[in-house]
């Protein structure tokens, strides 16, 4: 079931992101003393009692200034309100009622949302009651005193919030989109690729490095599926990045990788694989994300019949973290091989979520053992694999029960992973292998228990 959306609204530095983290019991929203840290919309899941909802953190609203990113922040807040059921206005109890709060309150009255008012930075009950009093003048109903830092008053606020959420029976089921993070170094053509995929100018494209600083979400239907494409800020080495918008954009790019179903890693065909590309590939593998490597600007490469296979071999030798990922040579400028991106990404997601029965896994493992026996230690003790089973998906994860894990070196572990891939597939997704030591008699009990279950 789709979750109703609550838009968090307020002027800069009233503690919106801190309150989001408190209400969702997380630390996902970036929090900093510098005003204006949040620019784009940031979504987090929350729940209270028997209700689930999504909180949308927005940037600090300023209506009398057109400089920097303030118009874009207002546009993002408008988009948040357009999809929300409730607008939660946050004000600063320590600063008191300001003219900016009154402007925002007047603006909110034109929205279709229910409006809830929270007075933040009320660090005690007595102080909160006195601070909240003057905010009745906004005409938005009862102000709820809260402390985002300490949690005071948040229970009462959440009680009120879920009481005005739309009834469960009125909330329609929605298809969950496949999330695709388009990642890469600055100026490799990520935004151009997004525009080519969508067939429209969805993202700003410029020769200036780092034009995209925020993540840009675009929904699109392809291959009979709903996709959410996330264009991210170009990722440079941390020591090359000054503290500021680009710094936070890169942090959000890493978060986009974490929340994606599949990553499209964009490589510049003219530059080849750089050290930063390798770091990014390693990050994707560490996060366990499915991946497709797109080599962009293929139209600018002088080529003959042998150019593509030779370049693929060279690129793969440097992207050894992602030797399991498919590779496409594309041109966002001409549209060459843009359409296959979806079929390749769809296959990668399917394999990422796939599960295989224990019996099939063990057929592959026992076949691998027949071709290459486990190593023997200097003391003459040989490694033994009793059985294996898939314990998770996204990414596919397997536990191998063995007599002693340290008897299996890196070389043999890589061999087993290759054999699992050859026998089971899993193209486009990393595999996780866990080696667990177990006594033989414990294994026999496990196997007997499994046999009894299958016969029931």
UniProtKB/Swiss-Prot annotation:
Organism of origin: Prochlorococcus marinus (strain SARG / CCMP1375 / SS120)
KW Ion transport (keyword) present: no
Keywords: GTP-binding, Nucleotide-binding, Repeat, Ribosome biogenesis
High-level lineage: Bacteria, Bacillati, Cyanobacteriota, Cyanophyceae, Synechococcales
Binding site for GTP 2: 184-191, 231-235, 296-299
GO molecular function, a single term: GTP binding
General function of this protein: GTPase that plays an essential role in the late steps of ribosome biogenesis.
Descriptive protein name: GTPase Der
Every EngA-type G domain range: 4-169, 178-353
PANTHER family according to UniProt: GTPASE DER
Residues given in the record as GTP 1 binding sites: 10-17, 57-61, 120-123
UniProt similarity note: Belongs to the TRAFAC class TrmE-Era-EngA-EngB-Septin-like GTPase superfamily. EngA (Der) GTPase family.
Segments forming domain KH-like: 354-439
